[in-house]
């Protein structure tokens, strides 16, 4: 009977350990081959540091870039004026936030973010579904956002919204990316098709 020498046995253990570690490191790491494919062209969301993840959003026909609300958190937004109703154009907005890895696992962070949104907007009908984005942990949410009064004559009517959140880790920092689509006419067939494509084709990838 063949016997393993101590050196061979140690080598086998080391190899197994290395394989296990590599598997743990790759778990939840996004990659291009895991992204969903859609027919709409993709637009790159500008990054502000070399550490931030690469984000890309599908832009269906009729949707256009709008920079009116861009700020530190809101990184990209598109709208479709042709689908406007009640003085509101359907929008798709991409946000990016930083969270310390000490906050917990990605799934916990996404759940906490959803709880904060629910409290802030006083939502009562939120539904969530775990998912992935290019292989990274994700959380899909659906809800109706309440009316927003911005002035005596300026009101944003209630909107049906769907959000897709996902998390990317870079060192000791989590980047939480969210794309949210919303409209006042959720039954519009064009909006339904476009919004589904935007959420399905959204990409989150390593910066390098």
Predicted features by range, described:
Residues 92, 173-184:
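Short, well-ordered beta-strand elements
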Residues 70-74, 90-99, 159-161:
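Hydrophobic alpha-helical segments that drive targeting, anchoring, or assembly
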Residues 79-108:
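A short acidic-to-branched-hydrophobic micro-motif
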Residues 100-101, 145-148, 183-187:
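Solvent-exposed loop/turn segments at secondary-structure junctions
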Residues 50-54, 87-91, 136-138:
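Extracytoplasmic
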Residues 83-86, 166-173:
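Short glycine/proline-enriched loop/turn "hinge" motifs that connect secondary-structure elements
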Residues 2-77, 82, 155, 181-208:
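N-terminal targeting sequences that direct proteins away from the cytosol to non-cytosolic compartments
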């Amino acid at each position: 009977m063949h016997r393993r020498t101590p050196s061979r046995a140690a080598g086998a253990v080391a190899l197994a350990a290395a394989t296990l570690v590599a598997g743990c490191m790759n778990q939840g790491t996004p990659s291009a081959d895991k992204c969903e494919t859609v027919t709409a062209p993709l637009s790159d969301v500008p990054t502000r540091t070399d550490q931030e993840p690469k984000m890309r959003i599908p832009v269906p026909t009729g949707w256009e870039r709008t920079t009116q609300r861009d700020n530190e958190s809101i990184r990209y937004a598109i709208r479709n004026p042709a689908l406007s109703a009640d003085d509101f154009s359907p929008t798709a907005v991409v946000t990016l936030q930083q969270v310390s890895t000490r906050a917990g696992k990605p799934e916990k962070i996404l759940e906490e973010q959803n709880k904060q949104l629910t409290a802030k907007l006083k939502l009562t009908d939120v539904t969530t579904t775990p998912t992935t984005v290019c292989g990274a942990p994700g959380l899909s949410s659906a809800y109706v956002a309440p009316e927003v009064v911005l002035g005596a004559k300026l009101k944003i009517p209630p909107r049906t919204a769907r959000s897709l959140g996902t998390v990317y880790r870079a060192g000791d920092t989590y980047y939480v990316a969210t794309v949210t689509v919303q409209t006042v006419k959720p039954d519009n067939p064009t909006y339904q098709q476009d919004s589904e494509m935007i959420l399905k084709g959204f990409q989150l990838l390593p910066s390098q």
